[in-house]
Design a protein with these regions (language model features):
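Short, Lys/Arg-enriched N-terminal segments with co-localized hydrophobic residues
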Residues: 8-28
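Ribosome large-subunit tunnel/peptidyl-transferase-proximal elements
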Residues: 26-130, 137-140, 158
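Charged phosphate-binding loop/patch that engages nucleotide di/tri-phosphates or the phosphate backbone
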Residues: 141-158
Length: 158
């Protein structure tokens, strides 16, 4: 078996007229997984009496894949998360009445605000989804990772 080395020029210094070389071994391990090597599993979480922020941090870590040893920041290596009993989720302190969520329509004077109490009456899953969304990256990868979150009312889910 022949042992050979391939060198790559990483810097050429014209002043002193020498070359910095780095050795490239073709049999070295890759630091990141390829797309075809990624695997996903499913987690089921019961949100009964869970605090929104603490549950959102656990979910965002699972969705991003930070609980795996193969975590890669630029790839979607996370797992799917199913959350049930979302109507029984809670906030600490007086945040349920006092916290405000803002959104803007894009028109002048178009800022809208709502509290978790009003949001919980219409869409109980929206508060947790917003918390998880704001913990994920803001680009295309974050939007793709957010689709791995499934939230359902009650014990039964499809």
């Amino acid at each position: 078996m022949e042992i050979y080395q391939i060198y790559q020029v990483i810097q050429y210094n014209y002043r002193f007229d020498f070359i910095y070389l780095i050795s490239i071994n073709p049999r070295t391990m890759s630091k990141f997984l390829k797309k075809d090597q990624l695997t996903s599993s499913w987690f089921e979480i019961d949100a009964k009496n869970a605090v929104v922020g603490r549950l959102a941090t656990i979910i965002s870590k699972i969705i991003r894949g930070k609980n795996k040893t193969t975590y890669t920041p630029h790839m979607d290596d996370g797992d799917f998360v199913v959350v049930k009993n979302i109507e029984q989720i809670r906030f600490t302190g007086k945040k349920f009445q006092n916290k405000k969520y803002y959104k803007h329509t894009g028109h002048p004077g178009g800022i809208k605000e709502t509290t978790p109490e009003k949001l919980h009456e219409k869409k109980p899953e929206q508060a947790l989804k917003l918390a998880v969304k704001r913990m994920l990256p803001g680009g295309v990868l974050g939007k793709k990772q957010l689709t791995k979150l499934k939230i359902y009312k009650g014990d039964v889910h499809p």
